[in-house]
Design a protein with these regions (language model features):
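Nucleotide/pyrophosphate-binding catalytic subdomain
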Residues: 1-171, 175, 181-183
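Active-site loop ensemble at the mouth of alpha/beta enzyme cores that anchors a bound cofactor
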Residues: 185-191
Length: 191
């Protein structure tokens, strides 16, 4: 929304953030609609909130709608409904949201795209000798530290949120792959 509104600074108040998010959501959906139409695919905008995962009736409704869309060959473009949620009731990040949606639809596989190839044993932007961890058997505190937790109690995004999403997804039986989004052929290789 900031780009569409030609804003140079992030909004400060919750109401301003929500208004900008509402503008941005339309632009984002339009972009996805144009991209998927090149492949003769129909999309549906599907905005969710934390309440959709914590209230049983809302959860079942979201599940039924999602599965119905998929059955019809329609691609649900899922995002958090930032125009109506406050910070304290947010899912929080798209990695977590993707793991929740994977559970919602009983997905076999969740692919999370990143700006790097995956989890490294240390930050590859700081250390030349960083090595890609190709397979993680179990997510423990050491893995979380590798992901950027750095001994703190809270992650702020990046690889840490992807590892937390991986932990959530694998607990419900969904396989998860973290791959570079800069290489479109990765998705085909993974599938």
């Amino acid at each position: 929304g900031m780009g569409r509104l030609k804003m140079s600074e992030r909004p400060k108040t919750l109401t301003e953030k929500q208004a900008v998010a509402a503008v941005g959501q339309v632009a984002l959906t339009h972009l996805y609609q144009n991209l998927f139409s090149e492949y003769n695919k129909i999309i549906a905008q599907f905005l969710l909130t934390k309440a959709d995962f914590s209230d049983r009736n809302r959860y079942l409704n979201a599940r039924n709608v999602s599965l119905n869309l998929l059955k019809k060959g329609i691609i649900p473009v899922v995002n958090e409904n930032d125009a109506v949620v406050a910070d304290e009731i947010k899912v929080g990040d798209n990695d977590t949201l993707s793991a929740l949606v994977a559970g919602l639809i009983d997905a076999d596989l969740l692919i999370i795209l990143s700006d790097i190839e995956g989890l490294y044993n240390k930050n590859p932007q700081k250390y030349d000798d960083a090595k890609l961890i190709k397979l993680v058997g179990k997510i423990d505190e050491d893995i979380k530290k590798m992901a950027g937790m750095e001994g703190s109690k809270f992650g702020t995004g990046g690889m840490y949120t992807k590892i937390i999403a991986a932990e959530m997804a694998t607990k419900i039986g969904t396989n998860l792959v973290i791959a570079s989004g800069g290489e479109p052929e990765n998705i085909g290789k993974i599938i």
